[in-house]
A protein has these predicted regions:
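A cross-family "folded-core" feature that marks the main globular domain of proteins
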Residues: 2-491
Length: 491
């Protein structure tokens, strides 16, 4: 369920969001037919949605007219922050968004009042709840009505993560939806944990603040986390953390929370790699996992062994980036805490993009995980695959898993010209394919030969392209097409 908005928001709202996304991602604009092809809507509906989006922008003073019509194309003229603000204001009137916001501060919501406040009939409201449950039941949650009260049923930790995921995708830091939690106080807590000596983007800090605000809101409304459902190493991890006393004091100055909530908040910082080194060394954390959760420890070390097998010269004790181990450990801790709650809070369809650009990457990692943990639930496996995949690409290219394309460059030019051509070809291909580019003397039969004026008949079965010395735009297009065709033959 890549686009879970479809289960929560109305059809028209989803169309408007998709339309806005298409225009934002195509800065040169799209004509009405191109929009129709991408969104599969007739012209009249598209124009109605475009007009509505501009009306929303005017009403909320996001900007006067974000979508203009020029040179027969519709163009979004706003900035990134204006795009997020506009998207947020399109979504805000949605009834189920309002319902989930009410659950931040309540254990139940009156069904009759909810219908009245959102101008809906009871039958319409029930249909919306039923549709949302198709999504929620996949992670053990459910919206139910008992004695005219709406309840959200499920494990508290899963409910919290689901709310965070939804609110972050809707608000993206443009607004603060937590009416009973002071934004400044939460940001002070975040700043106290994250070292002031390291730059962490506004968005990442805000995302972490959304976690804390959701936890505080739910706890204050009587929806307390169960310590019994936290990972078995939680207490040991927290007890060895020198920040516990400082954090407890800071939070208690502003919020009255049970001890288990303080511990849960501290534990959550571990799922953010940027915060990780503030707490423990890698060795300390691994030692705790090894003692209290052999399964989690083995999962991490098995994946490290998987990397080592693919890259024998790689030194796990001296990775090229300091974030490799934090990314790997935080990924496993995330899965241990939230289990099979797989929601993509970023709004990027990662598995879809990976399947297009490097189709063997995530499936290979998934297979490696399954070889050691064959009974993982589907969503848990999906989440762990993604987290370990993120750690892998901190060190190596995701194209490592794709078939290698052997390219031979043949020219009759001076060596420095030859070098310039090879660099241009490498820059064109390095983020798209797993390839080796050789000049004059190939180590084996090439898949593709790039020639300038040279005619070489030695490799008669290899695909050939004649290119200009400057590697013109048409040459680049032909090279990309040839590489894609070769990959199709290799799969």
């Amino acid at each position: 369920m890549d686009n879970y908005f479809e289960y929560i928001f109305s059809k028209e709202t989803c169309q408007q969001i998709l339309l806005l996304e298409q225009l934002y991602n195509n800065p040169l604009g799209l004509d009405i037919d191109e929009l129709g092809d991408k969104i599969d809507l007739e012209r009249r509906t598209l124009r109605r949605h475009l007009s509505y989006i501009n009306d929303v922008a005017n009403e909320y003073v996001v900007m006067s007219k974000p979508i203009i019509f020029q040179k027969k194309k519709y163009v979004f003229t706003g900035s990134k922050s204006e795009y997020y603000a506009l998207k947020c204001n399109i979504l805000k009137p949605e009834p189920l968004l309002n319902l989930f916001e009410l659950f931040l501060n309540s254990q139940s919501v009156n069904f009759i009042d909810f219908c009245k406040e959102n101008f809906m009939s009871e039958s319409t409201a029930r249909r919306k709840l039923k549709k949302a449950n198709i999504l929620l039941q996949s992670i053990g949650m459910k919206l139910t009505i008992r004695k005219d009260e709406i309840y959200i049923i499920g494990e508290e930790r899963i409910i919290r993560y689901s709310l965070i995921s939804l609110f972050w995708r809707v608000y993206r830091g443009t607004e603060w939806p937590f009416e009973n939690v002071d934004e400044g106080r939460v940001e002070n807590i975040v700043s106290s944990i994250i070292s002031s000596g390291r730059y962490i983007s506004y968005g990442k800090r805000k995302h972490l603040a959304f976690y804390l605000a959701t936890f505080i809101s739910r706890s204050q409304s009587g929806n307390v986390i169960s310590k019994a459902l936290l990972p078995e190493y939680s207490s040991a991890l927290i007890a060895n953390n020198h920040y516990m006393g400082e954090l407890s004091q800071l939070i208690e100055q502003s919020f009255k929370l049970p001890q288990v909530e303080l511990e849960f908040i501290l534990l959550i910082f571990y799922i953010f790699p940027e915060c990780y080194e503030e707490f423990h060394s890698v060795d300390d954390t691994l030692a705790i996992l090894k003692k209290y959760s052999r399964r989690s420890y083995s999962s991490i070390m098995n994946f490290v062994a998987f990397i080592k097998k693919r890259h024998p010269k790689w030194d796990k004790d001296s990775p090229s980036t300091p974030f490799f181990w934090p990314m790997l450990i935080s990924g496993r801790l995330f899965v241990d805490i939230f289990k099979d709650a797989y929601f993509n809070s970023s709004g990027v369809r990662i598995f879809k993009h990976a399947g297009t650009d490097y189709p063997r990457f995530l499936p290979t990692i998934r297979k490696s995980i399954l070889s050691h943990e064959p009974k993982l639930a589907t969503n848990t496996l999906k989440s762990l695959t993604l987290r370990y995949g993120q750690a892998y690409i901190m060190e190596f290219s995701p194209h490592d898993f794709e078939p290698k394309i052997k390219i031979l460059l043949l020219t009759d030019s001076a060596m420095y010209i030859e070098k310039i051509i090879s660099q241009r070809v490498e820059n064109l291909l390095k983020y798209r394919f797993n390839f080796i580019l050789e000049i004059d003397r190939p180590s084996s039969t090439p898949d593709l030969i790039l020639e300038t004026d040279v005619i070489d008949t030695k490799y008669s079965d290899s695909k050939r392209l004649f290119i200009n010395l400057e590697v013109a735009p048409k040459d680049r297009e032909n090279i990309l097409t040839a590489c894609k065709d070769i990959l199709k033959e290799k799969y």
